[in-house]
């Protein structure tokens, strides 16, 4: 793996995931620490969830994704309505142009990396701050990867003895992903109105090997029951589904 990708993408993903969980009220605000984690010279601290199990989960998720990065072209955090298990928001990082191999003539500075990632995270924060507030305990989240030529599930051997934490992690990373299809949970009936999605392009990164595109998707039209009870306030003149204009 390219040394710049390995070094800084891990920090970037930690900020990215925690910012979404905080601003979308996936977990209560009081479960986040606001005063200890600062990265990429952001003007404010990044809220980091304090729950030990979630800290471990996010750290392992990031290491898992990085271990598969040559196959992964998109990483998404999906916001799921607890009442119906449907995705109502999606935050996407596109890695399709990442450079995975070190180049001898490639010279970038830490300042350049910090500038790019700071702009990217600031773009995400400004977008999240404008979204309708989410009611308490109405949503959860899922991590999703889009991958090419990634084979999983071949290392699971119930008779195999696991002698180290490294072996345990290797087996879990091979078996803890579930294959799914886009929109597979949507209601299967003739009366269901297909959803309409609002796509918002956000600032990514374009420095050396760290070429990342960032965007978000938000459900704005469809069956009223999909979003019922999730959002507590809306922009003036906007319905529960937002505006199509």
Swiss-Prot record:
PROSITE patterns hit by this protein: HORMA
Domain HORMA: 3-203
GO BP annotations, alphabetical order: error-free translesion synthesis; error-prone translesion synthesis
Predominant location: mitochondrion
Keywords: DNA damage, DNA repair, Mitochondrion
SUPFAM superfamilies: The spindle assembly checkpoint protein mad2 (SSF56019)
Subcellular location: Mitochondrion
Assembly with partners or alone: Forms DNA polymerase zeta with REV3. Interacts with REV1.
Role description: Required for DNA damage induced mutagenesis. Involved in DNA repair, mitochondrial DNA repair and translesion synthesis. Has a role in the bypass of abasic (AP) sites.
Family under the similarity heading: Belongs to the MAD2 family.
Annotated protein name in UniProt: DNA polymerase zeta processivity subunit
Gene: REV7
């Amino acid at each position: 793996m390219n040394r710049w990708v390995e070094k800084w993408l891990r920090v970037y993903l930690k900020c990215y995931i925690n910012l979404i969980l905080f601003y979308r009220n996936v977990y209560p605000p009081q479960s986040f620490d606001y005063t200890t984690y600062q990265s990429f010279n952001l003007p404010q601290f990044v809220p980091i969830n304090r729950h030990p199990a979630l800290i471990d989960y996010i750290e392992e998720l990031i290491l898992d994704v990085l271990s598969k990065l040559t196959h992964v072209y998109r990483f998404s955090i999906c916001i799921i309505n607890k009442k119906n298990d449907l995705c109502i928001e999606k935050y996407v990082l596109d890695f399709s142009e990442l450079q995975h191999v070190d180049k001898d003539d490639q010279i970038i500075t830490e300042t350049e990396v910090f500038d790019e990632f700071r702009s990217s995270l600031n773009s995400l924060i400004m977008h999240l701050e404008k979204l309708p507030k989410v009611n308490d305990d109405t949503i959860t989240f899922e991590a999703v990867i889009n991958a090419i030529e990634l084979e999983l599930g071949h290392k699971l051997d119930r008779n195999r003895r696991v002698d180290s934490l490294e072996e345990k992690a290797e087996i879990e990373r091979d078996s803890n992903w579930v294959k799914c299809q886009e929109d597979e949970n949507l209601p299967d009936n003739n009366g269901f109105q297909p959803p309409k999605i609002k796509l918002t392009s956000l600032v990514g990164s374009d420095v050396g090997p760290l070429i990342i595109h960032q965007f978000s998707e938000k459900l704005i039209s469809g069956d009223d029951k999909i979003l019922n009870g999730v959002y507590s306030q809306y922009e003036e003149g906007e319905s529960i589904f937002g505006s199509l204009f």
